[in-house]
Amino acid sequence: MDITNRQAVLKNFLGNSPDWYKLAIMGFLIINPLVFFFVSPFVAGWMLVIEFIFTLAMALKCYPLQPGGLLAIQAVAIGMTSPHQVAEEIANNLEVLLLLVFMVAGIYFMKQLLLFVFTKLLLNIRSKTILSLAFCLASAFLSAFLDALTVIAVVISVSVGFYTIYHNVTSNHSDKDITDDSGIDNQDSHETLEQFRAFLRSLMMHAGVGTALGGVMTMVGEPQNLIIAKSAGWNFADFFIRMLPVTLPVFIFGLLVCLLVEKFKLFGYGAQLPERVRQVLTEYDQQASAKRTKQEKMKLIVQAIIGVWLVLALALHLAEVGLVGLSVIILATSFCGITNEHSLGKAFQEALPFTALLTVFFAVVAVIIEQSLFTPIIQFVLQASPSAQLSLFYLFNGLLSSVSDNVFVGTVYINEARSAFEHGIVSLQQFELLAVAINTGTNLPSVATPNGQAAFLFLLTSALAPLIRLSYGRMVYMALPYTLVMTIVGLLGVEFLLVPMTEWLTQAGWISLPHITNGVAIPH
């Protein structure tokens, strides 16, 4: 039947998203300018932040780039922020964008090796509890040297590989469309697939939390860690040792949570790998091993060598993370014989939509800065007593990181703490303790939602999430035990262990106070 032009426009707007969702976005776009001009720019700013979080929460209804982008464009158009401020935020976070564009694409060209290693791991460890612990530990270790996004990209690649192998076998698809379950025609196969999805969901969440457990420990683990370390004048070893009073107890209890939720099948964990899936993966592995030519074996060896280069380059910070990723692309494609432009393009398909989304997010961050949305909170915290400041900085960082971006929150708070030190409001010792509280506050409680951790948001908006039915709400629910334990143990560490342990480490000669002058930290 014929439809009117108005109906055609409405159908095209945000595509197949539900009508109620389309109406909600339209409502936001109508209300925001009215509130900004006739009520309060501050209120309008917070409304924009909440609306953007809503688009992230509804990521499976509609990719957040479009609705979030419309809100961001309007915010710039009505004067909530300026194009210059947005460009400045993008420039400040160029390292993160380069990471997404190049590092994630670089990992794509190492998928053969990763799938080989993790398939062996999965098939040889039959205990789900031990396997979950192995994934969590591996992610934590890798995240201490690589960026968490890189690690999540690795695990996503592996999980998509597992899912594709089984789905193609059980659905008999000639076109290999892994999003279409119509080829699975019996109830048993459907139930097995659902169990396999639950199994992969739990592994992904363990790996995701593992990136937070490891990423908080070192100055290269997360982008904001590097900013905090630079402000405090710490090198790699200084940063690691100063964080230990808080990060070590959190790490131990985080692993304990991993074991308990698997053992007692809590919060959606505990799903076993179906035996039928194990058989399919085992047969695939045996066939792949039998068919593997010398040329393919050499590709695996080359990828392993490139993997060593990747870890060393990042651990020693030989170049910016994104540039290291570019070197991985060049080395892997050169020595594995991938020279076709079309083949190269596939590597960027996963990362570029998220890169665009993160750029939109920086526009929202520009609004937060322009409208001083966090200023009242920061002023309140700095008015507290020195002993209360540590816990308040930790808690407010955690709260804001859960609804905002932890890179932004960490940067804002360390700059405010640094400014307070330079103006004589806090002492040097207090500033360094605040730096620890800020770092742990931005990294630990932020696992509560995908908004705080870029790695979690990347997972939520990846091609894997809809395949394994990993929604925003399910991620929050499955992260809950980790969130509670990591936040509470981290708070107790900041409250009771940080000061005495730092004093003991200083007396033992493990750490020394830097001399900070003219805005530059210079270790003795």
Swiss-Prot record:
- According to its UniProt entry, this protein's organism is Yersinia pseudotuberculosis serotype O:1b (strain IP 31758)
Q: What UniProt keywords are attached to this protein's entry?
A: Antiport, Cell inner membrane, Cell membrane, Ion transport, Membrane, Sodium, Sodium transport, Transmembrane, Transmembrane helix, Transport
Instruction: Mark the transmembrane ranges.
Output: 13-33, 98-118, 140-160, 239-259, 304-324, 325-345, 358-378, 448-468, 479-499
| A Gene Ontology molecular function term of the record | sodium:proton antiporter activity
Show the InterPro entries listed in the entry.
Na+/H+_antiporter_NhaB
In which broad location class does this protein mainly occur, judging by the first location in its UniProt entry? Answer: membrane
- Annotated function: Na(+)/H(+) antiporter that extrudes sodium in exchange for external protons.
A GO cellular component term found in this entry reads:
plasma membrane
Protein name, as recorded: Na(+)/H(+) antiporter NhaB
Q: How does it sit in the membrane?
A: Multi-pass membrane protein
- What NCBIfam families does UniProt report for this protein, alphabetically? NhaB, PRK09547.1
Q: Where in the cell is it found?
A: Cell inner membrane
Q: Which family does it belong to?
A: Belongs to the NhaB Na(+)/H(+) (TC 2.A.34) antiporter family.
- What's its catalytic activity? 2 Na(+)(in) + 3 H(+)(out) = 2 Na(+)(out) + 3 H(+)(in)
